[in-house]
Amino acid sequence: MKLPEIFASPANVRTVLQGTPIFSKGDESGEMYVVQSGEVDIVLNGKIVETVGPEGFFGEISLIEDSLRSADAVARSDCKLLPVNRHHFLFMVDEMPQFALHVMKGMADRLRRADKRAEG
């Protein structure tokens, strides 16, 4: 499943320049992002904990939990992002179970990488 193809719409693409914050820890959230091109760093307590590249996504946790942002997201390079709002996200989960599985797999992969980093 290629998320950029599902959510791509020229009117929907958000261009973000290198070094630009996308959101900050503690911000209210209303959308997740799919990376169409470029890279985004996820930063927690001043440390890069994940770099998300093309076809990856970030910001989904706050949509699922309806919570504040848990980390900062900063454009590592110039990038094109596809925002997915809560309404569209929930619609996709209802209508395309494989989308929900894709998101869960991405979250599980991220958790596994975090566990490996914590182990040393």
Named regions from a protein language model:
Residues 1-120:
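Cytosolic regulatory regions built on CNB/CRP/Popeye-like sensor folds
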